[in-house]
Curated annotation (Swiss-Prot):
Keyword Disulfide bond annotated: yes
Expression tissues: Expressed by the venom duct.
Function summary: Probable toxin.
Propeptide: 25-45
Single GO term (MF): toxin activity
Keyword terms of this UniProt record: Disulfide bond, Pyrrolidone carboxylic acid, Secreted, Signal, Toxin
Signal peptide feature range: 1-24
Name this protein carries in UniProt: Conotoxin Am6.8
Length: 68
């Protein structure tokens, strides 16, 4: 189960790195929140966007994400 979660997180991170930041991150805050909710588990401490440096640092902190 843990391996599956790790693999899924890794896959999402790799997919996001293949996109440009402008494509990966919506500018509208509500869209961005919906996207976060869809791809993230609530108990994760890092979000893929922060890991690939694609979301604004202020949004990362507000959403509870911790940059690496």
């Amino acid at each position: 189960m843990i391996r599956m979660g790790f693999f899924l997180t890794l896959t999402v991170a790799v997919l996001l790195t293949s996109l440009t930041c402008s494509e990966a991150v919506p500018t509208d805050k509500r869209e961005m929140e919906r996207l976060f909710d869809r791809i993230l588990l609530k108990d994760q401490r890092q979000c893929p966007y922060c890991v690939v440096h694609c979301c604004p640092p202020s949004y990362c902190q507000a959403s509870g994400c911790r940059p690496p």
